């Protein structure tokens, strides 16, 4: 599509609908996975390990996801990711066996990698660069809305059918997501061969290693910044409830604080994307991280529910205005040929950060204090802001002109 003919309304249902439903499905089952493991007799440490298999499945599946997307096309990779997740939910909900349950958790992580990479690659291909940040921010926003709605729908189903009801909601949402995604035009039908690029007069088959070598500067600079961003974002989700527990707040109060912060986070995605498209990526990326960092540094200074709410809202505001920034920067710098390989490596770095962030918080909390660990996470946000402020290309002042094809 050209900028003159492109409209968000044209792609809203088929592009964002699957993401909304995928988020709803995952939001429905993620809170009950630990409860299911405990009901099956798993100890608390084993339950934590089983939940961690979801993140591990995503981490280890980013490269295979890129290969699947390159081979079968974005549309069918999105469909496969949704259906694979539905199957995984069935294993978790009705197996009755911890080994099969563990496999289901790992498969959920696999499906996240496949679905997320393929949808990002698809929209990078079809959306004009002038609208890219708005679309990527909306993509991230619809996923967050789905994740927000999911637990409420699951709660009603659990009331009627027990824990299995949540998995039923998740499976229905994922199947609907796959059906809707199947209506997307198939990019593999286009004339461009994304598996090869021409060097001189000879085509060269692209591999993960060749893509890594060709884009190593991007991964070492912007990629490192994205790793830090991912670590901060994941750790903030743990830091707020842990500090609430440190303040001895009631669980219901903690839930309200977290819910209000999530609402702020969820509502800011489109304005942020518009600013990125019109003024440049740096105008959103840097303020997002600075605000998150300030909120995290303030968090250990809070002493009651009111001050904790203010800090949590600041953190959520910073994260909310940065909705879609990781996907946008990845899309901006992904090459036309081998795009799925590039995005697989990009997501791999983000998942490494997501895995390491909470581990660092845990280590600092154990060796120093919880407040020190949270403050270190805030400092990491400022470090990421500086890294990205320096390395986001100045030519990218508007609408991602730094993209290379």
Regions found by a protein language model. Give the residues of each.
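Helix-loop boundary and gating motifs at the non-cytosolic
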Residues: 9-55, 221, 230-243
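Structural signature of the two symmetry-related core transmembrane helices
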Residues: 76-90, 171, 283-297
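Core transmembrane helices of Major Facilitator Superfamily
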Residues: 26, 107-119, 314-326
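C-terminal membrane-cytosol helix-exit motif in multi-pass small-molecule transporters
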Residues: 172-194, 384-392
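Cytoplasmic helix-loop-helix junction between adjacent transmembrane helices
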Residues: 106-143
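Helix-to-loop junctions at the C-terminal end of transmembrane segments
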Residues: 61-73, 268-280
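Juxtamembrane intracellular "pre-TM" segments in multi-pass secondary transporters
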Residues: 1-9, 186-222, 405
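Helix-breaking motifs and short loop linkers at transmembrane-helix boundaries and internal kinks
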Residues: 73, 94-96, 280, 302-303
């Amino acid at each position: 599509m050209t900028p003159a003919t492109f409209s968000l309304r044209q792609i809203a249902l088929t592009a964002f609908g699957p993401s909304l439903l995928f988020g709803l499905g995952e939001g429905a089952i993620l809170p009950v996975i630990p409860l299911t493991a405990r009901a099956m007799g798993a100890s608390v440490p084993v339950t934590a390990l089983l939940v961690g298999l979801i993140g591990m499945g995503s981490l280890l599946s980013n490269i295979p996801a890129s290969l699947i997307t390159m081979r079968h096309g974005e549309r069918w990779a999105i469909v496969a990711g949704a259906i694979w997740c539905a199957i995984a939910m069935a294993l978790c909900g009705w197996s009755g066996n911890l080994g099969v349950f563990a496999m289901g958790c790992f498969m959920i992580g696999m499906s996240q990698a496949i679905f997320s990479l393929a949808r990002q690659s698809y929209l990078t291909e079809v959306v004009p660069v002038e609208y890219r940040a708005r679309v990527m921010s909306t993509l991230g926003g619809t996923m967050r809305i789905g994740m927000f709605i999911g637990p409420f729908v699951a709660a009603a189903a659990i009331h009627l059918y027990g824990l299995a009801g949540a998995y039923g909601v998740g499976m229905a949402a994922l199947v609907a997501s796959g059906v809707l995604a199947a209506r997307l035009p198939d990019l593999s039908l286009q004339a461009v061969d994304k598996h090869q690029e021409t060097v001189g007069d000879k085509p060269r088959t692209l591999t993960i290693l060749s893509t890594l070598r060709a884009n190593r500067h991007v991964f070492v600079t912007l990629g490192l910044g994205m790793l830090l961003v991912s670590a901060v974002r994941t750790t903030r989700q743990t830091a707020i409830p842990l500090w609430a527990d440190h303040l001895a707040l009631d669980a219901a109060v903690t839930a309200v604080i977290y819910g209000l912060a999530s609402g702020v986070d969820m509502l800011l995605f489109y304005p942020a994307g518009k600013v990125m498209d019109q003024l440049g990526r740096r105008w959103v990326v840097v303020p997002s991280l600075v605000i998150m960092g300030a909120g995290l540094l303030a968090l250990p200074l809070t002493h009651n529910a009111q001050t904790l709410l203010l800090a949590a809202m600041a953190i959520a505001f910073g994260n909310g205005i940065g909705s879609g920034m990781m996907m946008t920067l990845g899309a901006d710098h992904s090459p036309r040929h081998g795009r799925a390989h590039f995005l697989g490596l990009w997501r791999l770095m983000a998942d490494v950060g997501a895995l390491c962030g909470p581990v660092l918080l845990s280590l600092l909390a154990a060796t120093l204090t919880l407040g020190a660990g949270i403050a270190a996470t805030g400092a990491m946000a400022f470090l990421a802001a500086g890294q990205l402020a320096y390395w986001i290309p100045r030519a990218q002042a508007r609408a991602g002109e730094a993209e290379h094809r």
